């Protein structure tokens, strides 16, 4: 019964691909008078469950892919499952469609989340039967055996800078919220921030509290507003404490924004979103949109690398200072010096 259900979904999915495609940001129906279906390259992206609309990492991926689609005239399909089970069903359908395709249409499948790691590594060789199909797997530092490319953007250096510079801001304590203690990008971001914070000399006495949203691998990437509010309130030692939130988790750029009291302190993660009622002088940026734009160009030119690890030195990450760096220079902080230390420490981790 389950097998019949899967084939029914595959049939419906194939019909959807044939009936409604996406070229850049324009959705159109196939003209029945056309003699041949489109042969334009197709990029399909799958996101983690309920992750689009996060105003950070996933939304930047969407923008990067669509910018490339508009530039190169490729078709795109974005899939956001409601659950892990639905995500695995989507993956199986995509792999079946790509490995069995009889045409010469170039197809790139982008898996954006490490929650699909087991499936990707068990099934990537299936695509070797189609020389026009390729795979790009994000958020892993371990290359695939067999077909497919991998890309990892290391947050250690940028978060080291943020941890080193943030204590100079005008708040009472730091709250570092991490999704879980297992996801590599989250763990390394946390390590970078803590190492940077501990490197400040002379020591600035501002407590650093660390909170994990989940103890499960892959957990902590969905966050209700009520949970965000509870975490924030539990951190305050006193009602008048000024807490600076550093969220490397689900809800980083939406749930926490909605519950933060006026004049709160915040370090934006992945993207910069101006908030008039909050102080977010430091913003840690992951340039996944521009990186993906470049990757798709390399895929079109058949030069996509097998694996790359990018970071602060490569432009994969950066810091954006909302109000410039004058407030740091007033305290004789050498921002460029901190950057060079962060780049060196990040490079030592990956032997760059």
Name each model-derived stretch.
Residues 65, 160-205, 306-330:
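An alpha-beta-alpha
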Residues 150-174, 284-303:
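Hydrophobic alpha-helical segments within soluble ligand-binding/sensing domains
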Residues 45, 101-114, 136-138, 238-250, ...:
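Periplasmic-binding protein-like
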Residues 21-27:
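Bacterial lipoprotein signal-peptidase II cleavage site
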Residues 16-19:
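C-terminal motif of bacterial Sec signal peptides marking the signal peptidase cleavage site
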Residues 37, 43-64, 68, 79-88, ...:
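Extracytoplasmic "Venus flytrap"
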Residues 294-352:
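Hinge/cleft segment of the Venus flytrap/periplasmic-binding protein
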Residues 128-154, 272-277:
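Flexible loop/hinge segments that line or gate small-molecule binding clefts
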